[in-house]
């Protein structure tokens, strides 16, 4: 829908208002995820075969590859190599799901499971404080460097932290899930649709509320946070 609107307005409107142009750009932002999702799913069959052959060595090797790309990209300034991390980082995150599916993650020693979120969080803090990686895991306008373009080692340690935390809380979470099974089944059925359209809703709301003089408190204030609850 937004792609059609964008094409039509470019063809039919000579002087496109900046607000409308910006709204169309923002509404299309979530589609980056859809493209990567289709890419990862398309490569699932060969990645499963590699998983069966190499096991844990595969994600470890991919993580080393991500680090090498970061060193060459940021250290040597060879920006062309950054495209490799679009595959390595997102495929690595997806690869960990195979270990959950075949039970490998569930067979891990309890100490390893407990250590994973600690190591992941410690690594993330180190990269974003001692290292030069941005604190934001997404992209913040004005920052010279983003962790998502290209994907960086920071996203890998973030994945280790979150996956480790999920495994650590798995038993309790399964109990919660059983208690609200119908709600989870219903929301999971529409979660991708909500994700793809949520920026459109924000853009439309902004287009209506801003001209009406809706208050815009300073970023970070209590009023600013209250309007986002």
PLM segments and residue spans:
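Alpha-helical transmembrane segments and their immediate juxtamembrane cytosolic regions
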Residues: 1-229
